[in-house]
């Protein structure tokens, strides 16, 4: 049996009003607490309130000790005690204890499923019964399909490796450095850094020795650049590494950071420390003999195809040449159609499928001839062709005649004083549309924005910016004179109109806009597109038409309380003998509960003469009334500790020396919290939680060993 978490011996006689005798062992408890949680004791104490002792039969003292600990909010439910506590909870009619045992059996317990089912039926635990039924169905599916799908090899693994680059401050424009490669799951992994266009690209490369087949490796990875005296620079990337056996070609994925930011924040004596945490999601081998249809490029879209060809997934990520294998007649509505730039033999597409051999940028201009030297190496972008004036045509006779251009749409000046105001938009669904002028003259690190429209009490507008030979198209949400913090969840689709009536470029995003409590707060979300793609396929006489279809799904005010009250501490319908005043709000509580949980309240209450004033007011120092509400609920044994309330409860508990509540909060963060390791470590340092700090240190050391 686990050790005692709370004493109910003679030392508590001064603060209790009734004694329960269980097989000659005496438990000093409070009538009010037991009556609050148990219908049995509510009836027992109702008749004769002056009787000081009651005998409890057919109960073991050690089991009753654990039951009382759970009633008083202690974490006393374990594998060794749950089946002892359940019959007492049913005997004494305690719904709170039954719910805690049920939650333990669902989320933590490792006993057999049949044992859980029997306990659920015996004690009427409906949620546990539903959980067991779901587990039974899952087990039946596993038994029916014991063998994995043979078509693809699936691996799931995580690893971390880091490297310290020396003399990074001496990198010249175009210089590249790489780390020593490591081998994991028969693949080699290398970190690259490259300085180009006043940026430093930090990337991860995946390769394989003796490449005889094509491979795709799906991986999610986080790259951390250690900063000096400021938060580290962290970037998350999800993508596919494609290994081409024919060209012996490897992929690299990564992010770009401004060189000035790297130099000012991350370089210490010329050293740059890079840590990469990689999670391999899936590895698939594509044998050479498999038929390879024409390749297509997708922009931020993920689709799966199953048909005549082997089932594959669209490859996506931050790399210049995403590729995919399509089935015979796929839907090309969301794709930009191009030809493999180093294709050796021209293949003709079926008549039913769209023309995949001539990309839109080459249908309106002469197709540049690729040199044999470039064809033998990695894929290269087509040479930049000059832009022709309105109505003009390229000089190449092989290009088809361009269709007549429709009348130009009305152009709104961007960020101009004379721009017509956008009409107000009503409802949760709306469309923003703007024609940006003189886009071809945009320089690097410049931006244009359209007029703002009002929807759902927030201001919305479209923004385009040029950076690193890419055009960033984004939707911006803002609000002036913000008095509260807001979080806006929205689904939106950005559409760039095609050139000469061509296929538009679409990208869908599920975004969260965070509006902070400042004078003018805004946030933008969007997508990046290659600048050459914009120039050749979507820009008409320097104009670019952008449209956003927005659906606001949820607006949350972060200043609103993140919890609902589990218990009302008002004067009606509540047993109380002392009133606490916190930030002007009154809490009617029992002094026995305060004394049993808090050493500071024990000291305060011991100095008050309750004989002269049976119901006394105690005014406490100002603090958050919401946090104090959660703290009192925890003292009463309610499950009020969660990720949203744990910080506030810890603050109040440490202020009033409630060691038991602090211990429960610490145990919750270690066992149940979904906070990140960094957030847990910050919480441990802020509240000086030694056990939680040791827990975080242990898992940090495990990370470094991986």
From Swiss-Prot:
| SMART domains from the UniProt entry | BTB (SM00225), MATH (SM00061)
Which PROSITE patterns did the record assign?
BTB
Start and end of every BTB domain? Answer: 16-80, 576-644
Q: Which residues cross the membrane?
A: none
Q: Where is this region: Disordered?
A: 344-419
| CDD domains hit by this protein | BTB_POZ (cd01165), BTB_POZ_ZBTB_KLHL-like (cd18186), MATH (cd00121)
> What protein name is recorded for this chain?
BTB and MATH domain-containing protein 47
